[in-house]
Amino acid sequence: MADSGLREPQEDSQKDLENDPSVNSQAQETTIIASNAEEAEILHSACGLSKDHQEVETEGPESADTGDKSESPDEANVGKHPKDKTEDENKQSFLDGGKGHHLPSENLGKEPLDPDPSHSPSDKVGRADAHLGSSSVALPKEASDGTGASQEPPTTDSQEAQSPGHSSAGQEGEDTLRRRLLAPEAGSHPQQTQKLEEIKENAQDTMRQINKKGFWSYGPVILVVLVVAVVASSVNSYYSSPAQQVPKNPALEAFLAQFSQLEDKFPGQSSFLWQRGRKFLQKHLNASNPTEPATIIFTAAREGRETLKCLSHHVADAYTSSQKVSPIQIDGAGRTWQDSDTVKLLVDLELSYGFENGQKAAVVHHFESFPAGSTLIFYKYCDHENAAFKDVALVLTVLLEEETLEASVGPRETEEKVRDLLWAKFTNSDTPTSFNHMDSDKLSGLWSRISHLVLPVQPVSSIEEQGCLF
């Protein structure tokens, strides 16, 4: 019971000191001064301290170690220790102060044993206050003397208000504060690094999306430009290629050169006669493997008889100009009343003999004058698929019964005129129907084979008067 009574005043005084903000601030200042004392202890030896300081600090550690002993003869003995022992204790106190900045909390927190229980609690509280004041005064003085710095020592009131328990509490609070300050700083670097990486990744994703959008938005345009460039390059290379790279066709070149001269020799002809005639024969000559012969029908009125004969001959001659061989000439005039089978045989012999001997063109004049049955031989030479000779040209002429042919007559009207004439000549009720004789169906089949191109010829007065002199 006596011990509890003695401890209560001291505990109350400690609680009051803990609750006082000014005391806490003084504890933090004492901690900072203690750290300066550690540096002072390294720079200056404890030997340079004055004797008064040694005596004051000797009381501090001894008071903490003995637990605030009463004023008895033992306290007098403590003051009579040898001087060297006092210096060692001063050094030890500086070392302890450098490590922990304050006296150990265990010794300060424990209640010292009181050898004199007769003292009242108020006397013990007074001695405790004196002890705390002496220990707190020693540290600031040593720090001030050792470092020689311009720091101002704390006041006497603040030193008296501090206690060993509060010094330990201040140290713990400072350590906690440092850990709290360092912890966010240590953790902030990974967080900042992570945020920077996230921002960088987001920026890269945005750039990828922009590139994708840009590609898909401009992709079709780029594709079209590339296709146009390829086509333009192909066309340019095709037209700018040297002439020697194109395979030459001597027959075509000779035909074009000679056919172009006919326009001057036969003036007054329709434009489509030259255009269509050139295109039709040029296509056939340019074909490497023609499937059928080139068959053309020229027609004219009776006033253009000589012009028709001369023009058809020169067109066939232009077609075979590369071979330097004249075309085959067959005339149906004067054979109307001959035997159709005989005429058919003669026509077959002349065409086959000439084509087999290298002639590439044949001119059949007055096709309308042949016996009807004899014209069936042209199935053999003008068939679409099974013609006997496919790389040849057959030029047929039909003289209309009309006296004149208007220049305004077009190709279709000209074709109808020729067709009507042949139907009138080759089909009638008096003609017997047999295999060797013509009928309407056979004539329709023949017409489809020989009527690829029907062109009108206008008379040339000089030719009609003087004949074909060239």
From Swiss-Prot:
Biased composition annotated in UniProt, kind: Polar residues: 21-34, 147-170
Regions of this protein lying in the Cytoplasmic compartment: 2-214
Record topological domains on the Lumenal side: 236-470
Keyword tags: Acetylation, Endoplasmic reticulum, Glycoprotein, Membrane, Nucleus, Phosphoprotein, Transmembrane, Transmembrane helix
TM spans (from-to): 215-235
Region of interest called Interaction with TOR1A, as start-end residue ranges on this chain: 236-470
Membership in a protein family: Belongs to the TOR1AIP family.
Name the record gives this protein: Torsin-1A-interacting protein 2
Origin species: Homo sapiens (Human)
Gene from which the chain derives: TOR1AIP2
